[in-house]
Amino acid sequence: MASDGSPSCCSSEPCAGASGCATASFCPTNTTCLPNTCSTSRCQTPSFLCRASLPACCLSPCYLAGGCNSPCLVGSCAWCEEGSFNSNEKETMQFLNDRLASYLERVRSLEENNAELECRIREQCEPNAPLVCPDYQRYFDTIEELQQKILCTKAENSRLAVQVDNCKLAADDFRSKYESELSLRQLVENDITGLRGILGELTLCKSDLEAHVESMKDDLICLKKGHEEEVNLLREQLGDRLSVELDTAPTVDLNKVLDEMRCQYERVLANNRRDAEEWFAAQTEELNQQQKSSAEQLEGCQTEMLELKRKANTLEIELQAQQTLTESLECTVAETEAQYSTQLAQMQCLIDSVEHQLAEIRCDLERQNQEYQVLLDTKARLECEINTYRGLLEKEDSRLPCNPGSGAPMPNSTCEPCSNSMCEPCSAYVICTVENCCA
């Protein structure tokens, strides 16, 4: 019996005397295939399978005991030696038992490996099994602390920038107030200069009026003198010739008339002066009102302009702060995305490696399952072979005569090898039976 090898037939002569043999095959005498070999160069002849002789007409087909299911013609087995079949029964059984024990040991080791691989697969497939990932928590804490410091520094910088801008706005306010006060001072000085010119004109007008009054006084004095001279001349001409009594009003006191005229002129002058002063006061008041309203409007416009400037600067500062905050948030988002993408890539690599290991384990498991099935088939064939050997031994023990060496050998008998080229390698020796031999 040979395992994992091709069936080998032994012959010392070609099968020339057997009818129906188309071809004759040869193999070395007294050879049988050793386990785990397929060449006939390492074959040995088991002594327990030898027959002294077989009938010449023994050409009935026999089958391989290892499940080869291919018939071979059995004549006189030239690979069977002279001797008794029962002489090597113990050695044969020992040999078969050793082979069976080795196969069982191999099956047991493969089952242990299979169980170990199943345990590993079960551990890998457990859903709640924690994935071993590197601990980056302290790095995350450091990064978060630095980010907080950066945000605090940015906020402090923004606050200082706001304070600087507020100081600039206050300086601009004071500068604008100084400019407005300077413009008001210049306007007041211009008004004072204009009023001084008006005062000079009024002084000149007053001088002219006083000179006119003096000239009128001189004219009045001249008129009085002329009237007195005329009166005296008329009196001298009339003399005492004419005495005229007129019932007329009493004579007018010239001093009184002059005083009245003086009072009248003084009243007119006072009225004119009062009117001029009122006109000047009204014009001055109107100019002051216009100046005040213009100053108020200018101050309101300047205040509104400063307020708008302040609002524009505040909005610009807020815009810069929001842009800085947006940039910092975008940087933070980019860093977070890069960090999570790195973690995702690491997890994906870990998943790929685990899947690769799982695929390798599955391949190993399938391969070991195939090997296990092959070993189970081999075990079944071995058990069948052992049972066959046991039955053959029992039959041969019952059929052999007391003197097993008395039989005469039959010449020109061979055992034909399996002619089916598609047959699988037999896992047992070729058994030559004599059940169908023609007597």
Curated annotation (Swiss-Prot):
- Keyword Coiled coil assigned to the entry: answer is yes
Extract the InterPro entries matched here. IF_conserved, IF_rod_dom, Keratin_I
Annotated region (Linker 12), positions in chain = 237-252
Superkingdom, taxonomy of origin: Eukaryota
Q: Where is this region: Coil 1A?
A: 90-124
Sorted alphabetically, which keywords does the UniProt record give? Coiled coil, Intermediate filament, Keratin
Segments of this protein annotated with the region Coil 1B: 136-236
**Where's the IF rod domain?**
89-400
- An example Gene Ontology cellular component term from the record? intermediate filament
Give the residue ranges for region: Head.
Answer: 1-89
Q: List GO molecular-function terms, semicolon-separated.
A: structural molecule activity
Site Stutter — annotated at 338
Region: Coil 2; residue ranges are: 253-396
The cross-references to Gene3D superfamilies, in alphabetical order and at most eight, read: 1.20.5.170, Single helix bin, Vasodilator-stimulated phosphoprotein
> Which PANTHER family does UniProt cross-reference here?
INTERMEDIATE FILAMENT (PTHR23239), KERATIN, TYPE I CYTOSKELETAL 40 (PTHR23239:SF90)
Quaternary structure (record)? Heterotetramer of two type I and two type II keratins.
Family indicated by similarity? Belongs to the intermediate filament family.
What does the further note read? Answer: There are two types of cytoskeletal and microfibrillar keratin, I (acidic) and II (neutral to basic) (40-55 and 56-70 kDa, respectively).
Q: What is the protein name stated in its UniProt record?
A: Keratin, type I cytoskeletal 40
Species name for this entry? Mus musculus (Mouse)
The organism that produces this protein has a lineage beginning with: Eukaryota, Metazoa, Chordata, Craniata, Vertebrata
